[in-house]
Every structure is written in structure tokens, then in C-alpha cells.
């Protein structure tokens, strides 16, 4: 199992933009990998990060394909969907990096509860998906 790591810099720590970005990327990714997703139970990992005053959305997308043709298609589709969905004032038209990393760790149950979205769980109430020190309801 591999994960693509997609990092998008945000203009401000706006959680509404972050969650809209999450849904946009998931929809694009599912359209690209529908065959794989129908055979495996996979998770998506999303994290809102801050470093030196810069906010970014880190998105980890599961895949079993790592060939360059697939990588190029994935990059093109995700860029197109992000640019079409958001104005430049919300998400800059620069994706800092898109790359594949091997999944070599197993998250704790707490991290699964806080950060992972099961496929099909995108309707109705959703768990807090950003790094959050508050109670879940406060997010």
C-alpha cells in the first residue's frame, strides 16, 4: 500500500475551506481510483498543519499504483479540481508537492478516530479532521 502526499498551502486557517478542499480531493480521487476502491477498504488521512505562520492541508491518498503515468494523471486531475473549485483568495494556485510514500506505520486508535475518514462516511456529521487540541464538539 502506498499513499500520495498532497500538500496545499492555505491563505488562512479557515476550517470551512479545509473541509471543502477535503471533499473536492476525495471526489476527484474516487473518480480516478474507483476500481481500486471497490475492492479494498481504504482510509483517507487529512491534517491541517501550521508551521512558522503558514497553514497547509496535508492529504494522504491511498493507492496501489505507483507508475509515472498514473502519477501524472493523478497530479493533473487533482490540480484541475482544486483550481476549479476554489478562488485564488482561498487556495493559492500552487500545490507545493505531490509525491508517493510507502505506508510504513499503523496509527493509534485515537489517531484513526480523529483523522481518518472511512469511505462512505462523508454524509452527515463527521469527526474532527484537523489537528485539534479542543474537544471534538468544539471543532
UniProtKB/Swiss-Prot annotation:
Protein name from the UniProt record: Uncharacterized protein ORF16
